[in-house]
Regions:
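Active-site regions of metal-assisted phosphoester/phosphodiester hydrolases
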Residues: 1-109, 191-193
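Active-site environment of divalent metal-dependent phosphoester hydrolases
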Residues: 2-4, 31-38, 59-65, 231-236, ...
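His/acidic metal-ligating clusters that form di-metal
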Residues: 4-41, 137-139, 246-250, 278-284, ...
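Conserved beta-sheet core of the metallophosphoesterase superfamily
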Residues: 40-63, 67-72, 167-168, 384-448
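Extended active-site neighborhood of metal-dependent phosphoesterases/phosphodiesterases
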Residues: 186-210, 265-362, 392-401, 414-433, ...
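Conserved, compact domain cores that house catalytic/ligand-binding motifs in diverse enzymes
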Residues: 219-297
């Protein structure tokens, strides 16, 4: 339109069409009007200018005026954010300079969740909820003893809410052991995160799940222990069928389950397989490292997917009147082996655990426990080669009153009664990932009796 009158009539036609559009509507082109004109002022009543009117667009060789615009209807202007807006330095292609606006559109609410939530670290009257989204998000957990009166938990570090990320870890503390809690996770997409401007998209809410922390004096529980799955989905699903009628309280993955992680996507895919397979949205899971979790390009990144007890890959905690001690053996070859390229120092990690074991074995919680369970990936007894931890740990453990040690790594099921190999406690070693050798352990504590079924 070359005249103001024609432009105004054209604008009326455009406005009459807006009401029928439910999605974001954009208007772009040569409007033959400068920013202070009556036409642009009238346009801005219903449209938001997305391009930068302070940058001239015409004539292309030496711009003196701004007459080209990209605008969005205000009626549906919440489904996107402007990332950048600029005039392209191109004086020859046309008599107008091209203008470019980069937008980020909002994801649909039902596409925001990448994974279901899974529970971690159910100790110290608290629990951690983790999940992943497909887009950067601001997240929180809504929880309570019933679904009509909910509190909100967020991840706050040094006074700042952790957000604008895809992998989410939120701790809920101050919980009452023995009390059933209901919770759901909420994720609101963050379309723009700038110093002085934030733009939010749609919000996704999960369905409600539930969990219950064990009371301090509980005498009965059931735990499931997997090992050496090596990302074999069919093996894992077959083992899950073996325990489908078992009601269990927590799950342990005793190493080499998420083995040799290549990248984030691969790790997320199999972790989701594991957590969903054991109903990790309401049954807490402990992930332990084997030597294969330490290998490949994403091995360091794998840590972000878990919430370790005490923020260490080794730990101890009580489940009722039973003490659980978990150790991390590290790699199965010396640090100076050529395959590690000088990038490992598991000698230091093993020595740290010497101090940890000394404190643990003399701790009140350990001494007062009715039963004591030791779990680590590489066996100290019954391994096909010497465990690199043996010289450091054996003397501490040979008199420790553990009732059982649950191990893995050899890919061959074995049971070694107390004393058979100089072991001060019975040792059970889980099988491998092949269908004919795979095992799953059921650890059952009833009153004063501790049973293991493999």
């Amino acid at each position: 339109s070359l005249t103001e009158e024609d432009r105004m009539k054209s604008l009326e036609i455009v406005k009459s069409l807006i009401a029928s559009y439910k999605k974001p509507l954009f208007l772009a082109g040569d409007m033959n009007a400068e920013p202070e004109s009556d036409f642009i002022k009238e346009l801005q009543k219903d449209f938001q200018i997305l391009s930068n009117p302070e940058k001239h667009t015409y004539p292309a060789p030496d711009p003196k005026e701004t007459i080209d615009y990209i605008a969005a209807s205000k009626q549906n202007a919440t489904g996107f954010a402007v990332i950048s807006a600029r005039v392209v330095n191109e004086p020859m292609a046309s008599d107008h300079r091209p203008i470019l606006v980069e937008l980020r559109t909002a994801e649909k609410a039902d596409k925001i969740f990448r994974t279901k939530p899974y529970l971690q670290n159910p100790v110290g009257n608290g629990i951690t909820v983790m999940w992943e989204t497909t887009v950067p998000s601001y997240c929180w957990v809504e929880y309570g003893t019933d679904t009509t009166r909910l509190e909100r938990a967020r991840m706050i570090v040094d006074g700042q809410v952790v957000c604008n990320n895809k992998l989410h870890k939120i701790r809920i503390d101050g919980l009452q052991p023995g009390q059933k809690y209901y919770y759901r996770v909420c994720s609101q997409e963050m379309l723009l995160y700038q110093a002085y401007k934030k733009v939010f998209g749609n919000t996704a809410q999960s369905t409600f799940s539930e969990f219950t922390l064990p009371v301090a004096d509980t005498e009965s529980f059931t735990a499931i222990v997997f090992n050496d799955l090596h990302q074999h989905t069919n093996t894992f699903r077959t083992l899950c069928k073996q325990i489908q009628d078992v009601k269990y309280d927590f799950v342990v993955f005793n190493g080499d389950c998420v083995d040799d992680p290549v990248d984030h996507e691969q790790a997320t895919t199999f972790i989701s397989e594991l957590t969903e397979g054991v109903y990790g949205d309401h049954i807490p899971i402990f992930f332990m490292r084997g030597n294969h979790e330490i290998r490949n390009a994403y091995s360091i990144g794998l840590r972000d997917h878990f919430d370790y007890v005490g923020d260490k890959t080794y730990a101890s905690f009580n489940w009722g009147d039973t003490r659980i001690v978990m150790l991390d053996c590290g790699e199965d070859k010396p640090d100076d082996h050529w395959v590690y390229y000088g990038l490992n120092d598991f000698t230091q990690l093993r020595n740290e655990q010497v101090d940890f074991l000394k404190k643990e074995l003399s701790a009140k919680e350990f001494k007062k426990a009715k039963k004591r369970v030791l779990i680590h990936h590489i066996p100290l007894y019954g391994n096909y080669e010497k465990n690199l931890c043996a010289n450091l740990w054996t003397k501490l453990l040979e008199k420790a009153p553990f009732n059982i040690s649950l191990n893995a790594h050899t890919h061959k099921y074995a049971y070694h009664p107390k004393g058979e190999l100089g072991n001060n406690y019975p040792v059970i070693i889980g099988g491998g990932y092949k269908m004919d050798s795979a095992t799953v352990m059921i650890l059952e504590k009833k009153n004063d009796e501790l049973r293991i079924k493999v």
